[in-house]
Regions:
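Membrane-embedded transmembrane alpha-helical bundles that form the catalytic cores
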Residues: 1-156
């Protein structure tokens, strides 16, 4: 385990932006767990299937509509343009949420717990609440590494 702790090249390129202390603290726990725990693997695969469904079935299908509208915007009326914009908004959400969900599931199979990254942002009642629910780990990163060091308060 000390070899794993010394290697600082553990990078997750999709999903939540996790704090290193959260991941490192879980490395010690992995040695206490069975290498393959059926319930953990099953839960991880369910997360991954949900993520693949969001990406392949929803996001990619909605992208066809959004792309068509944006590629030929000049030949459509207001209603279709609004529909294209709504489709694009859901495509973006489903793309981001699917990558995060797949990453959470694959990490869970390996014994790691990652934070949820989206909390139904399109049901927010304000822009502030939307941003709090959208890409949560990115917002926390901006808060902890930019906003607070530049003089912001922790209560904001």
């Amino acid at each position: 385990m000390d070899k794993l702790r010394k290697k600082k090249k553990l990078i997750l390129v999709a999903g939540s932006i996790e704090r290193s202390k959260n991941i490192l603290s879980q490395i010690d726990d992995i040695t206490d767990k069975k290498l393959l725990n059926f319930d953990r693997v099953k839960a991880g695969f369910i997360y991954m299937i949900r993520g693949f469904f969001l990406k392949i079935v929803i996001a990619d299908r909605i992208a066809v509509i959004a792309d068509e509208v944006f590629n030929r915007y000049y030949s459509y009326g207001t209603f279709v343009l609004i529909l294209g914009a709504v489709c694009f908004a859901f495509q973006i959400y489903c793309d981001f949420a699917s990558y995060s969900t797949i990453a959470i599931g694959s990490a869970q199979i390996m014994g790691f717990t990652l934070m949820e990254n989206f909390e139904t942002p399109y049901f927010a009642m304000s822009i502030k609440e939307f941003w709090r629910r959208w890409h949560i780990s990115l917002s926390m990163w901006f808060r902890d590494y930019l906003y607070i060091p530049l003089g912001g308060t922790r209560k904001a």
